[in-house]
């Protein structure tokens, strides 16, 4: 529910909320036997994740997700989180350790300190990881020695998922969804037919707020004038 709340908040504030998924994930439920032995139950559940619009980069020529050829999501991960990716399917453990050995690589964007309302500082002990979902040419996949299923043998391009860190590929797989889709949903507060991103409450209120500000300034100016010294001349 917190992911849905965060998406609804950004939808109203910025005009667009981004949801990623659903994915099937294994969730561990703690359990103990009568002898006190820890025997957790593993259950496959659907999972949705909120993605901030500040970390979401869609195809710039698309007006909606149906038109998007690709999207890129930007992750900010600690060493522990980066190493945790090794427990997920198809991540390259050796390459991840090489990235960790190279040291943190996160470069702050200009807007991040403003959003966080912190003093500006540029030393961030995190890794920047980019996640790509979209079209890839067949020749590129062959060069990376990706095993393609038989149904893609005659395809010129395929949908793929790539994770990058330190300019190294830490995961490259064929899009597992059937039918094939990019697993992101962009929900506009108010649809803008000529842009991928929608219109939020703040942008809708801009003209009204400017008008209210003008009336407030007029009220203050009138109050100042009415408080001026009044001189009466008796002829």
Regions found by a protein language model. Name each.
Residues 1-235:
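Extended alpha-helical, oligomerization-prone segments that build pores/tubes and scaffolds
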């Amino acid at each position: 529910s917190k992911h849905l709340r965060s998406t609804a908040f950004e939808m109203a504030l910025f005009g667009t909320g981004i949801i990623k998924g659903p994915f099937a994930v294994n969730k561990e439920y703690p359990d103990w036997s009568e002898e006190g032995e820890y025997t957790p139950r593993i259950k496959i559940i659907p999972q949705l994740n909120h993605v901030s619009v500040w970390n979401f980069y869609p195809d710039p020529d698309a007006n909606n997700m149906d038109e998007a050829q690709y999207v890129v999501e930007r992750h900010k991960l600690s060493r522990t989180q980066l190493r945790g990716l090794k427990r997920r399917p198809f991540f390259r453990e050796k390459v991840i350790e090489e990235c960790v050995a190279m040291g943190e690589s996160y470069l702050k964007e200009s807007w991040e300190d403003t959003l966080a309302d912190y003093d500006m500082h540029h030393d961030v002990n995190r890794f920047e990881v980019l996640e790509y979902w979209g079209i890839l040419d067949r020749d590129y996949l062959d060069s990376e020695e990706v095993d393609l299923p038989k149904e893609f043998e005659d395809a010129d391009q395929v949908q793929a998922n790539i994770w990058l860190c330190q300019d190294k590929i830490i995961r490259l797989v064929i899009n597992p969804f059937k039918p094939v889709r990019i697993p992101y949903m962009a929900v506009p507060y108010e649809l803008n037919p000529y842009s991928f991103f929608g219109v939020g409450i703040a942008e809708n209120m801009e003209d009204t707020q400017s008008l209210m500000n003008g009336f407030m300034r007029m009220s203050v100016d009138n109050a100042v004038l009415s408080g001026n010294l009044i001189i009466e001349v008796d002829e």
